[in-house]
Amino acid sequence: MRKKKTEVYALRRHISLSADKARRVIDQIRGRSYEETLMILELMPYRACSPISKLVYSAAANANSNMGSNKANLVISNAEVNEGTTRKKFKPRARGHCYPIKRRTCHITIGVKDISLDDEYEQIYSLKKPRWKNKYTTMIYHDIDSIGRVWDKK
């Protein structure tokens, strides 16, 4: 008996972006849930976030249409960045010289897994520690006059 397919991929090739810059963003979203991934990509200030978020949307749409899975059950299981082709141009310089310009491209693959269909992944996901710290700080009121005039000193 064949296993039911629980993972769906989305692939985008020849993105005009360096592979190292894309890996910086991909490493942050690997292993996270679909909603958490979209929030992270929305708030990160990098240029690589836009094509990666489009790929995450596409992978979720593929999972919805191919397997009929709910987007709340999706987890980014596989995310990889490979180097693509490098376009070479030449910039004309003084006295007949030219400097080479390399336009690097990359290929990004994102795999999305439905955790409701996979029993083994549910057990691992329940044991996983959260990545944020559960530290709560309390606000303490300080009386400024009792401390002294700190701002008057030069």
Curated annotation (Swiss-Prot):
GO CC, any one term: chloroplast
Example of a GO biological process term: translation
Keyword Chaperone (UniProt): no
Primary residence: plastid
InterPro entries, per database record: Ribosomal_uL22, Ribosomal_uL22_bac/chlpt-type, Ribosomal_uL22_bac/org-type, Ribosomal_uL22_sf
Alphabetized Pfam families for the sequence: Ribosomal_L22
Keywords: Chloroplast, Plastid, Ribonucleoprotein, Ribosomal protein, RNA-binding, rRNA-binding
GO MF annotations in UniProt: rRNA binding; structural constituent of ribosome
Localization per Swiss-Prot or TrEMBL: Plastid, Chloroplast
Keyword Plastid: yes
Superkingdom of source: Eukaryota
UniProt cross-references to SUPFAM superfamilies, sorted A to Z: Ribosomal protein L22 (SSF54843)
Gene3D superfamilies named in the record: Ribosomal protein L22/L17
NCBIfam families (alphabetical): rplV_bact
Family statement: Belongs to the universal ribosomal protein uL22 family.
PANTHER family xrefs: CHLOROPLAST 50S RIBOSOMAL PROTEIN L22-RELATED, LARGE RIBOSOMAL SUBUNIT PROTEIN UL22M
Function: This protein binds specifically to 23S rRNA. The globular domain of the protein is located near the polypeptide exit tunnel on the outside of the subunit, while an extended beta-hairpin is found that lines the wall of the exit tunnel in the center of the 70S ribosome.
Quaternary structure (record): Part of the 50S ribosomal subunit.
Name of the protein described by the UniProt record: Large ribosomal subunit protein uL22c
The organism of origin for this protein: Jasminum nudiflorum
Gene that encodes the chain: rpl22
